[in-house]
Design a protein with these regions (language model features):
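Catalytic beta/alpha-barrel core
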Residues: 3-8, 26-40, 53-93, 102-116, ...
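Charged helix-capping and loop-helix junction motifs
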Residues: 39-47, 118, 140-149
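A short alpha/beta connector and helix-capping loop motif
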Residues: 35-70, 165-185
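Short, motif-level signal for alpha-helix interfacial/capping segments enriched in acidic residues
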Residues: 1-21, 144-150
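Catalytic cores of alpha/beta
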Residues: 14-19, 64-75, 111-123, 158, ...
Length: 199
């Protein structure tokens, strides 16, 4: 899944076209409000501008009562991840998830996979997004132990810190989607990264 905020829109589209013969492709859209996480993301209208993408997932790093949710839920996104930590109670979370079948949960890297699975069991959520890094903070040393993904049967989208070695590790794992950003693709070694990904 290509991270939309990591490059110019036309470069995202070109990368999508070059990789689509080799991977099940998606575009990953980050929405941030500057409060829930200390950065800003793209606007919801950008989702419906991606006419080439067969699958779009939204990672909403925003408060659960942000008015932007109305616009987000109007988009054509296939999956929309709302942060478990943004809700004041599980009842509020459950009520929110009932608004749209596309809504799933995202988690900051404070929870073990077992804890996430237990939460998803309680809330009847069949897939989740895992922030391998804390959201919105560029330079971090700690990284989630992705070996523990073997402990869940749910589909997991891994966002943050994905490297070429991570892609190789999970390339043949159908229940894991990796968000490809600046560490794996969109950097000064772009062409070499592409060649590595398609070889």
């Amino acid at each position: 899944s290509l991270s939309y905020i990591c490059d110019k829109p036309n470069n995202i589209q070109k990368s999508y076209a070059r990789l689509m013969q080799h991977y099940k492709m998606s575009v990953h859209m980050d929405f941030m409000d500057g409060h829930f996480v200390p950065r800003l993301g793209v606007h919801p209208e950008a989702v419906d501008e991606l006419d080439y993408a067969e699958h779009i997932d939204i990672h909403a790093m925003i408060a659960c009562n942000n008015p932007a949710w109305e616009d987000i839920l109007k988009t054509r996104a296939d999956v929309i991840f709302a942060h478990y930590e943004s809700f004041h109670s599980e009842q509020q979370c459950e009520d929110f998830l009932s608004r749209d079948a596309r809504l799933k949960l995202a988690f900051k890297p404070y929870h073990t996979i077992q804890q996430i699975d237990t939460i998803c069991d309680r809330l009847a959520v069949d897939e989740f997004l895992l922030m391998a890094y804390n959201p919105g903070i560029k330079v971090q040393d700690a990284y989630y132990n992705l070996e523990t993904l073997a402990d869940t049967q749910r589909h997991v989208t891994v966002d943050g810190g994905v490297k070429l070695s991570t892609v190789q590790q999970f390339k043949d794992e159908p229940k894991v989607t990796l968000v490809a950003g600046s560490k794996v693709l969109f950097n000064d070694n772009y062409e070499a990264n592409i060649e590595c990904l398609i070889s």
